[in-house]
């Protein structure tokens, strides 16, 4: 990073976060994740027996246990096998149409799924580089790895991708060949644009190939490795939670199981997923009934949801469903693979405590000094720790919801239930209060049979029904609002006045439109936002900027200069410059000055660039807001070409270019999959020629353009 990078590319906050870890705005998670991971791993073992006995629990192979062993007071991990089988059977009989749809999906849709879908994920653990990479790049190198070792092309479908992984796992030794710069620190430049004021240099590329080898056992370890991270930007929590990201070797299998679960959940009335915001609210409203003598509404969370879930419980449930559908054995094995892998997962422990002085580092491995996690020492493998029980956050969201839903379909429970992973709301309809309490207790104990624990401190039962909370949406009869939780995030960035104003007003507009804010709240939110907006551009109170404007008798014309805001509820969707001109607040000369492309501070066409805080991955951002002279991005520093992330950045840029040209030439990809014969390049060329030939240009120009397409 050179000296002026902060001035040229990154805002001060980001710079501070890059240079000094552990500082920065509050909800950001910094530093080592080791403690959070160890807590996550030890919890399922502590909760397995009524009296915590980690040493004994470590010998457990599967999480099933007898009903009398279940801790009814505190959280309990594990499940009761017979109950899961019976509940799954019961659920299957009750929702026969949903199961038929699942069978149709397995026979017709599953073989057509493409593995390209996997590139839609976020960060993915790269088993080759042993760190997180963006999903498309991780997928690309995994496919390269498979093709290099199997010496054949891999078909486009997800099933052929999974089959290739199964084949690779059987090889005794696998290798991966890649290319890298042997001396990234030694930068050699060549001049490519000899402009006297600002010459442009390009780095001379050097490449050498390298080979990484895996034995069969090592590859299996990579397949079951989960990279762990702190959950980022969580508001209102003192302790950070961990989330896990698996490698692309297992993502394909997980995707199949999750999509199958989605197919069931879309056709089951009690699920709160996979529907989005407004539909969820409509679902909640339709569940409320007020016609019985006693009604109640129980809303709350499940405590330690991921730690107490067991992969085996999910596997059992799926096996029951698939067996009853009469699916072939290979489908049952396919659905079993991801749960088997998660049964033997290896979690990455992170850095731990590292003492550094100059170039000396001193790492303290687990078990060297006494700690509360000493029971786990026998499970340590290198810098990872194996963990049989429990799950990690962010893995099987839909399957875990399904597991919760099979347990509430009991004849004894009246009323209706909505569940979305660890969040739920249950409406009771009973004759007496005693009956309602009895049902609530039945619900709590039934959920314990599958390994889900209702949190005593976070659940509240309100009778008569009408007040509750689900998915951070609070309702009182019909009123549903959660924008108060969003207000702290409505802060202008301070890099571009036009975009900042448009984004802030957009959030408020959306909240008012969807009924999350009424008009008074909306007006207040607008006032708060305008205040923050002026403060961000030093136009509030007495500052250097306001003094300068006073001394030179400059009248403020726009809100970011200190003028009074012009937007109201009816005009908040309009651009500020256009609105002020329409209202006659800007004269012709001022308007020309603001929108003149030759302004000294008009925005440059270069896309700006920022680093994602979680993993310091560089990313390119484009800005689509209305250009004006107040849209000042200082011209970009060209040293970005020499960053250590250069190779990855180039890959990312090429990837974005290809996807954007495909989006432009094949607009149908937005709705469905575009199919064209030949390679991507040939089909793009053919489509481009077609566009030119059908255009209304004269023949001479058509010929000239067509000759330039190659």
From Swiss-Prot:
Q: Which GO terms describe its molecular function?
A: nucleotide binding; RNA binding; RNA-directed RNA polymerase activity
The UniProt record lists the keyword Nucleotidyltransferase: yes
Q: Which reaction does it catalyse?
A: RNA(n) + a ribonucleoside 5'-triphosphate = RNA(n+1) + diphosphate
| Cited InterPro entries | DNA/RNA_pol_sf, RNA-dir_pol_NSvirus, RNA_pol_PB1_influenza
**EC number(s) recorded for this UniProt protein:** 2.7.7.48
What are the alphabetically sorted keywords of the record? Nucleotide-binding, Nucleotidyltransferase, RNA-directed RNA polymerase, Transferase, Viral RNA replication
One matching Pfam family, short form?
Answer: Flu_PB1
According to its UniProt entry, what is the function of this protein?
RNA-dependent RNA polymerase which is responsible for replication and transcription of virus RNA segments. The transcription of viral mRNAs occurs by a unique mechanism called cap-snatching. 5' methylated caps of cellular mRNAs are cleaved after 10-13 nucleotides by PA. In turn, these short capped RNAs are used as primers by PB1 for transcription of viral mRNAs. During virus replication, PB1 initiates RNA synthesis and copy vRNA into complementary RNA (cRNA) which in turn serves as a template for the production of more vRNAs.
Q: This chain belongs to which protein, by name?
A: RNA-directed RNA polymerase catalytic subunit
- Organism of provenance: Thogoto virus (isolate SiAr 126)
